[in-house]
Amino acid sequence: MQHPTPDALHARLAARRFILAGPCALEDFDVAMETAHAVREAAEAAGLFAVFKSSWDKANRTSITSFRGPGLVRGMEWLARIREESGLPVVTDIHLPEQAAPVAEVADIIQIPAFLCRQTDLLVAAAATGRVVNVKKGQFVAPWDMRPAVEKLRAAGNERILLTERGASFGYNNLVVDYRSIPTMQGFGVPVVFDATHSVQLPGGLGGSSGGERRHVPVLARAAVAAGVDGVFLECHPDPDKALCDGPNSWPLDRLPALLKELSALWSLEHVC
């Protein structure tokens, strides 16, 4: 399976109408592969470009007993197979600079987690791979304060950049979305993604894990498209209530086609307004 070069992939993402979708974590290979094929089918039916997302290690879980993932070696093996068999590019995150190079051997997009968006060494290491880099805006960071993250990546020689809005802390155990962040961050000359599922998360809201209000995912995603976002990030799962990570805010896989068709229709309206 031939995949786009980093430059070609970034150009396609800059052309808008795309999704980054998949389970929160690689909890099971068969579940991940099933999800990847379903994401591709739903995206194609809606006329959207798709990238498969999932994490090989969830290093920022609430509890020491929380499921984290299969680890680097097995995780890269799984993602390589999913990438080849589904035909989708893949995005996954790193947490330490030394993880950038091995992850870049498989991933088309390297993602910087929200809590690590200011870590200079991590950003520079991701940039040095030459891959597209998606930096998630921290819940504690103002949209205009993401400009330095972009400047760090560019200073390291990488212009293939995405920024992702995923909500801002709003008191305790809650997030709120300020849609002004979309045009603000687009003003840095990069495509902007909206994370519709983490934005409905209730961080630590279940005590030993995070809660979520997935019923709000569609309205937040539609609002982001109406606000001019370039792409939408969606965690989805065949059975969210049994997911080992972020189930409360994950979108049911069987409801993904309808949601993507709604988003596609809204993106199409931009051309007639």
From Swiss-Prot:
Catalytic activity annotated for this protein? D-arabinose 5-phosphate + phosphoenolpyruvate + H2O = 3-deoxy-alpha-D-manno-2-octulosonate-8-phosphate + phosphate
Entry keywords, A to Z? Cytoplasm, Lipopolysaccharide biosynthesis, Transferase
Task: Note whether Lipoprotein occurs among the keywords.
Answer: no
Molecular function (Gene Ontology), one example: 3-deoxy-8-phosphooctulonate synthase activity
Pathway field of the UniProt record reads:
Carbohydrate biosynthesis; 3-deoxy-D-manno-octulosonate biosynthesis; 3-deoxy-D-manno-octulosonate from D-ribulose 5-phosphate: step 2/3; Bacterial outer membrane biogenesis; lipopolysaccharide biosynthesis
**Which BP terms does GO give this entry?**
keto-3-deoxy-D-manno-octulosonic acid biosynthetic process
Q: Does the keyword Glycoprotein apply?
A: no
EC class (word):
transferase
Where is the protein situated, by its record's location annotation?
A: Cytoplasm
So what EC number does this one have? 2.5.1.55
An annotated GO cellular component of this protein is: cytoplasm
HAMAP family hit by this protein: KDO8P_synth
The record's comment on protein family reads: Belongs to the KdsA family.
What's the protein name? 2-dehydro-3-deoxyphosphooctonate aldolase
Which organism is this protein's natural source? Nitratidesulfovibrio vulgaris (strain ATCC 29579 / DSM 644 / CCUG 34227 / NCIMB 8303 / VKM B-1760 / Hildenborough) (Desulfovibrio vulgaris)
